[in-house]
Amino acid sequence: MSNEARISLVARVAQLPTAQGMAPSANPPISILALAAASYGLRPSEDATVPTGFDPVAVALFEAIVEGAYLVASADGVFDEGERRTFERVVVAACGGQVPQDRIQALVSDLADQLREDGADQRIAAVAKAVSKKEHAQEVLRIAALLAAATNDVSEIERDVLLKLALGCGLEEKDVDLALAEVRKTLQALHGRAPT
């Protein structure tokens, strides 16, 4: 599968609502990621007036979802410029165009700096702190699992980060297995087979 096709597939899966990752009372159903991305896209610059519809809790949740995926993507210690650009493109596509590329680039740059300064365990704790509801924790885990499963088999170190995210967010080990099974099933259904 080409890189473009893989990015498109991952973005489609990320945008799909799930039983756990669906915004309550959304009609039509929308994923929590998509809803949080909409608010993040409205985030004002430091000098601007806060716009109507801006939700700082949703912004923090969006950042936590992206950081959870970033922590898994960089778990092996190798996150070169090519991987970073691909990760940024996946996030932009998964947001359905609601967040501009330059905002995602700035966010990923901040995440890289924070990971370098704080280490993975502190960043996992920061993600967990931003998550206040079980369905939000499940969405953080789902998107992180999606990024891990979409590129290849989930490595032991990626699974370890997924488990730490789950436990930090108040979930259990079985939730990691459920998230991985769900994203693999959805990837297979949308593509005909899971990417290898």
Predicted segment positions?
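Small-residue-enriched hydrophobic alpha-helices in membranes
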Residues: M1-L71, V78-T196
